[in-house]
């Protein structure tokens, strides 16, 4: 294969040309075919791809909690029981997705690299608002694929180091961004999770309270939505729960989430109506 630089052992010119601090912009020039939404039209809409389902986020004084169920579905079939849909974005933020699992995972990886690339180039991190805007730009780039059945919607949350509070951002399929001050949920079970959060949310609750109502919202969603997976006590599969505070991002261990699940189930045994 001929060397595009004309000089053996050197990187292509695009790697040596000064540009923006956006990795997505760089990729659009260096290898546009690698962008999630740049695959061109599909011969027919996709209807059988695996889908991730319900994600919730809850703000509390000093931070934010994000939690996601573990189920991926393919039509009426359970495609996977241990999917991880909530991920570290950078030191002070996290991101989850609902929708086409493959596209969602790819979008998350690109977003992580986008934030890391900016920090390496500029020597500083983006503000939380700027991170949310970068993610909106990436969601918009997937609109063509979404119109063909490969839709994915992210939920972004983080600790704002400038204001000292947890913030939540949601998006629609066309990349319209909106900030939610208290709680939000996306995915097939979101209407049930949001109803659960509406009933239990308090503005002054603690981090532990936020963790519990997040897990309980997923439990309620799984109770009414077949595409949302509830806690699997036999396989020891619990929701993914992450917190972001002034101390940064931290994913809770199963040993921490398990007792919360056990407590919820014990309470429901006494009061099946929730």
Curated annotation (Swiss-Prot):
Transmembrane regions: none
Chain positions listed as propeptide in the UniProt record: 1-52
Catalytic residues identified in the record: 53 (nucleophile)
Cellular localization per UniProt: Cytoplasm
Origin: domain of life: Bacteria
Pathway assigned in UniProt: Protein degradation; proteasomal Pup-dependent pathway
Annotated EC: 3.4.25.1
Pfam families: Proteasome (PF00227)
GO CC, any one term: proteasome core complex, beta-subunit complex
Mechanisms controlling activity: The formation of the proteasomal ATPase ARC-20S proteasome complex, likely via the docking of the C-termini of ARC into the intersubunit pockets in the alpha-rings, may trigger opening of the gate for substrate entry. Interconversion between the open-gate and close-gate conformations leads to a dynamic regulation of the 20S proteasome proteolysis activity.
Keyword annotations from UniProtKB, A to Z: Autocatalytic cleavage, Cytoplasm, Hydrolase, Protease, Proteasome, Threonine protease, Zymogen
Swiss-Prot/TrEMBL catalytic activity: Cleavage of peptide bonds with very broad specificity
The keyword Hydrolase is annotated on this UniProt entry: yes
MF annotations from Gene Ontology: threonine-type endopeptidase activity
Biological process annotations from GO: modification-dependent protein catabolic process; proteasomal protein catabolic process
Quaternary structure annotation from Swiss-Prot or TrEMBL: The 20S proteasome core is composed of 14 alpha and 14 beta subunits that assemble into four stacked heptameric rings, resulting in a barrel-shaped structure. The two inner rings, each composed of seven catalytic beta subunits, are sandwiched by two outer rings, each composed of seven alpha subunits. The catalytic chamber with the active sites is on the inside of the barrel. Has a gated structure, the ends of the cylinder being occluded by the N-termini of the alpha-subunits. Is capped by the proteasome-associated ATPase, ARC.
Family recorded in the similarity comment: Belongs to the peptidase T1B family.
Biological function: Component of the proteasome core, a large protease complex with broad specificity involved in protein degradation.
Full protein name: Proteasome subunit beta
Source organism: Parafrankia sp. (strain EAN1pec)
Gene from which the chain derives: prcB
